[in-house]
């Protein structure tokens, strides 16, 4: 073959000078071995050094395209490069001056020849090996006759399968690999999580000094207390509820049974709730009692509100967050959509107490979430992974958390969040209150509940998670081991008469000993333990199923998975190693709808297991004997973690809570500082930042809630007076005092905590009529009407008949008569007003309005010609803050009333009032400054 094509005496490499394989020839040109000898030696492992560069074949040049030996097998064709566009490097001729300069370059020059040569040596070595492999394949293919290349060659699909066989992990991200895949009901694998977040490191709670907190706020309503046991069963049956656990609270059937205060009830009514859902009827009393709960209900059953409402009350009892504090309540849910939904509910109900909520979930801005957490929020709604990220980055901490909720726990387990959920629970203080909600109650959820809940109450709504109540558990407490043998021999014949008996022992040696002893007593029985051959075990199980042997003595390992419906009695001769094993043991009976009995024999040394057994019995709605409970109480950890019974804490006694916000309605009877009014929390708690921080917004919210909560139609006020709080307070639709009959008015004004005075005292700068005390009276509904109604209220209290006349006179003379009435109110009730200012400490709460009850300051504020100030005094006159001052005001007005004739001219009354203002009224009050002449004087 001519290798010198293209020019005389010039050696050319492959791929140059027209070398091609003609398609028509039968004999394909073979690649002779000696044709590679020219460069085969140079392509040894020693590489191509600087000593012999001319021997480099042209297709091994840097950046050049390798030769295409076979068009059908373009093995080394590089499709990304085009040989026509590649600039080949310049290599000077041998013995040329340029070549000599190239060799004479110093070693430490800036050129990068050394790394390049090392790399090229490796590339050329690999290329030489590939060339040899290609030649061998060509030889093998040429030697085989009658084989079609198009069939034998590897196509795309075969290449893909070969590649996947060689690289089983190709394309699989390492984080997505899961050893244990979960499968859904159809048998399809559930996709694992996209990202595994390392759980939080373990924490030693004994080194942290946690402040105590209160969990129990539930006081049972008398209607629920009076229910008989049968009525209670009927109520739960009507609500389709099944409740199990130690001493569960009775369910309520209306919102009145929960004892919520007016702020929260206002938001509940606003959310269009008419009555609680079944899960709320039982779940809210459980959560208010401070008990741990497992709630099993379908989506849409109202379980979200069932843990949000008690959460708000739980938070309100604790002290306010300080800078750097973490949340008080944490709600963990599986998906960001559910997280946003629960966050919206928390915001809706939390604004009743100005509580802040933050949603923390994957996919949201990490920086914004961290900023919101650092500003402080009482409630955090989160997904597990993102909360762990924030805790690791010190954006928040879990030290203040005392209310922990896991919503849709089964979905979190399906998504692979088990370790994260457990690490979050382990980072929260051990004496927390934990609520677990799930749509199903699989074994994993049951195990989690046992690990993170203490004495939980299980509330099942609907037909989900049907508890197996076919097994009756009986616990026998015996003095010693021999007592067990006596008990067994005495009762075994009785048990075998009703069906097959399965005896459990813990160890193999004990099983053999017990079986031998029973055989000596004449009992026909079988033995089953882990060291037996499979054939022997199969024969024993077969005989037991056929009822050839009525008694079977077995260990735990051998008995797992036994499904024999004829077993009527299970006897735990030795207690199980743990409660899981115990559950498996007793599950051997009561199968396929058959009833069964499980006996457990305990001795005094089994106190550790007794605690677990008590909780297992309570969870299965089984009777717990006093002897068993006493034995369990000998165990220190059970005694310490056991729930405490008793009545719930009555809130608002002596203040307390976030910013000492008053909480009327939760059993509050006597209050030292708080005032029983709906709006008091707006006054007491103002966040430093946020929408509710400024006073104008607080006043708007106060007015809105005041009008909506205390609306009473004017025509119905006389009928409802004294029968309801709103009627007794005499509020009209405008928020001002209404004219009420004598008895009810006197009763309302003499009671220590009248809703009128309390509602008026709720907001700084508000008088009894619902107006701002320092503002001019320009609204007829809240100003003039308030004055007229107040006057008529005074007349009705004094017992005179001048009510109609006065109201008529004030209504006709809107100008001067209003002014004179303000002076009269000042004259009549200076004394009680000054006493109130010192006693009730309004100045303590709001220094800017502390002198609202001082006479001099009030007169000094007559920027509007004295009108506003005097009307404010009139309001102050009616606002007797306690029993004494009201009586003083009442007596004083009774004495002064004969001097006030209904038809006195307003100008004369003005003069009289101006004189009486200057007289001493028994208090060391500074002389009021001279009043400027106002337009009312004319």
Curated annotation (Swiss-Prot):
Residue stretches in coiled coil: 116-157
Cite the EC number.
3.6.4.13
Domain named Helicase ATP-binding is located at: 284-459
GO MF, one annotated term: RNA helicase activity
Annotated region (Necessary for interaction with TP53BP2) at 738-833
What is one GO biological process annotated to this record? regulation of apoptotic process
| CDD domains named in the record | DEADc_DDX42 (cd17952), SF2_C_DEAD (cd18787)
Q: Which segments show compositional bias classed as Polar residues? A: 737-757, 786-798
Q: Where is this motif: Q motif?
A: 253-281
Gly residues compositional bias, start-end: 1-18
Q: Which residues cross the membrane?
A: none
Domain of life per record: Eukaryota
Carrying Phosphoserine, the residues are: 58, 96, 104, 109, 111, 185, 754
Where in the sequence is N6-acetyllysine found?
5
Instruction: State the UniProt keywords alphabetically.
Output: Acetylation, ATP-binding, Coiled coil, Cytoplasm, Helicase, Hydrolase, Isopeptide bond, Methylation, Nucleotide-binding, Nucleus, Phosphoprotein, RNA-binding, Ubl conjugation
Q: Which PANTHER family match?
A: ATP-DEPENDENT RNA HELICASE DBP3
On assembly, the entry states: Transient component of the SF3B subcomplex of the 17S U2 SnRNP complex. Interacts (via the C-terminus) with TP53BP2; the interaction is not inhibitied by TP53BP2 ubiquitination and is independent of p53/TP53.
Name this protein carries in UniProt: ATP-dependent RNA helicase DDX42
């Amino acid at each position: 073959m001519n290798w010198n094509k293209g020019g005389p005496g010039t050696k050319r490499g492959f791929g140059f000078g027209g070398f091609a394989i003609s398609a028509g020839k039968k004999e394909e040109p073979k690649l002779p071995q000696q044709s590679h000898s020219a460069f085969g030696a140079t392509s040894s492992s020693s590489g191509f050094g600087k000593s012999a560069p001319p021997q480099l074949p042209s297709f091994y040049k840097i950046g050049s395209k390798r030769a295409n030996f076979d068009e059908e097998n373009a093995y080394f064709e590089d499709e990304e490069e085009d040989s026509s566009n590649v600039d080949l490097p310049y290599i000077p001729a041998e013995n040329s001056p340029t070549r000599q300069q190239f060799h004479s370059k110093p070693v430490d020059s800036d050129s990068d020849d050394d790394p390049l040569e090392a790399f090229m040596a490796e590339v050329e070595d690999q290329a030489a090996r590939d060339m040899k492999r290609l030649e061998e394949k060509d030889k093998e293919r040429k030697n085989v006759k009658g084989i079609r290349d198009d069939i034998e060659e590897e196509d795309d699909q075969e290449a893909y399968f070969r590649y996947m066989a060689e690289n089983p992990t190709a394309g699989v991200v390492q984080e997505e690999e899961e050893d244990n895949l979960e499968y859904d009901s159809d048998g399809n694998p559930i996709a694992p999580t996209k990202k595994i977040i390392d759980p939080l490191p373990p924490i030693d709670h004994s080194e942290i000094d946690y402040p105590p907190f209160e969990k129990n706020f539930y006081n049972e309503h008398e209607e629920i207390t009076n229910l008989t046991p049968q009525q209670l069963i009927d109520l739960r049956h009507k609500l389709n509820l099944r409740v199990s656990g130690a001493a569960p609270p009775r369910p309520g059937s209306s919102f009145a049974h929960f004892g919520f205060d007016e702020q929260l009830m206002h938001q509940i009514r606003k959310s269009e709730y008419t009555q609680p859902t079944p899960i709320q009827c039982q779940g809210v009393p459980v959560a208010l009692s401070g008990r741990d709960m497992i709630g099993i209900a379908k989506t849409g059953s109202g379980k979200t509100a069932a843990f949000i409402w008690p959460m708000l009350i739980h938070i309100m009892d604790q002290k306010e967050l300080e800078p750097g504090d973490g949340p008080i309540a944490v709600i963990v849910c599986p998906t960001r959509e559910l997280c946003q939904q629960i966050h919206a509910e928390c915001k809706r109900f939390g604004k009743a107490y100005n509580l802040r909520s933050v949603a923390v979930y994957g996919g949201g801005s990490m920086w914004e979430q961290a900023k919101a957490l650092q500003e402080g929020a009482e409630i955090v709604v989160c997904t597990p992974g993102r909360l762990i990220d924030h805790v690791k980055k010190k954006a928040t901490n879990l030290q203040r958390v005392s209310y922990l909720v896991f919503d849709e726990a089964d979905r979190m387990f399906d998504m692979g969040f088990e370790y994260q959920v457990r690490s979050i629970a382990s980072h929260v203080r051990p004496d927390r209150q934990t609520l677990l909600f799930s749509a199903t109650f699989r074994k994993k959820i049951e195990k989690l509940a046992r690990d993170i809940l203490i004495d939980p109450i299980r509330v099942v709504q609907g037909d989900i998670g049907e508890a197996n109540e076919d097994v009756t558990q009986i616990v026998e407490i015996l003095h010693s081991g021999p007592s067990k043998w006596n008990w067994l021999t005495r009762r075994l014949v009785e048990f075998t008469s009703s069906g097959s008996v399965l005896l459990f022992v813990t160890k193999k040696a004990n099983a053999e000993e017990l079986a031998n002893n029973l055989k000596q007593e004449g009992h026909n029985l079988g033995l089953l333990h882990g060291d037996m051959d499979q054939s022997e075990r199969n024969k024993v199980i077969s005989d037991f199923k056929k009822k050839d042997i009525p008694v079977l003595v077995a260990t735990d390992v051998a008995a797992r998975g036994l499904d024999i419906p004829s077993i009527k009695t299970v006897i735990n001769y030795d207690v199980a190693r743990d409660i899981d094993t115990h559950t498996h043991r007793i599950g051997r009976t009561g199968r396929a709808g058959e009833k069964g009995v499980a006996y457990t024999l305990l001795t005094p040394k089994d106190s550790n297991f007794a605690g677990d057994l008590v909780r297992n019995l309570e969870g299965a709605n089984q009777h717990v004997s006093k002897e068993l409970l006493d034995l369990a109480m000998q165990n220190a950890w059970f005694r310490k973690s056991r729930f405490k019974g008793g009545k719930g804490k009555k809130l608002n006694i002596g203040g307390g809570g976030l910013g000492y916000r008053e909480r009327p309605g939760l059993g509050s009877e006597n209050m030292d500082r708080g005032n029983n009014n709906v709006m008091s929390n707006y006054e007491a708690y103002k966040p430093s930042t946020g929408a509710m921080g400024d006073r104008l917004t607080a006043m708007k919210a106060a007015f809105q809630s005041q009008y909506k909560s205390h609306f009473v139609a004017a025509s119905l006020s006389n009928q409802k007076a004294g029968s309801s709080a709103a009627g007794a307070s005499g509020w009209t639709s405008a928020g001002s005092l209404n004219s009420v009959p004598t008895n009810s008015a006197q009763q309302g004004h003499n009671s220590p905590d009248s809703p009128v005075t309390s509602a008026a005292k709720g907001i700084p700068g508000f008088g009894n009529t619902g107006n701002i005390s320092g503002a001019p009276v320009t609204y007829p509904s809240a100003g003039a009407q308030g004055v007229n109604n107040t006057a008529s209220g005074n007349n009705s209290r004094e017992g005179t008949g001048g009510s109609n006349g006065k109201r008529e006179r004030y209504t006709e003379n809107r100008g001067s008569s209003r002014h004179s009435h303000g002076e009269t109110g000042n004259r009549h009730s200076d004394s009680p007003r000054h006493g109130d200012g010192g006693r009730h400490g309004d100045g303590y709460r709001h220094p800017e309005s502390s002198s609202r009850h001082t006479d001099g300051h009030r007169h000094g504020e007559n920027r509007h010609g004295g009108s506003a100030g005097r009307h404010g005094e009139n309001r102050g006159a009616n606002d007797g803050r306690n029993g004494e001052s009201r009586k003083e005001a009442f007596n004083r007005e009774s004495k002064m009333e004969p001097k006030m004739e209904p038809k006195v001219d307003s100008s004369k009354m003005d003069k009289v009032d101006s004189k009486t203002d200057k007289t001493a009224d028994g208090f060391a009050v500074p002389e009021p400054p001279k009043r400027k002449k106002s337009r009312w004087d004319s």
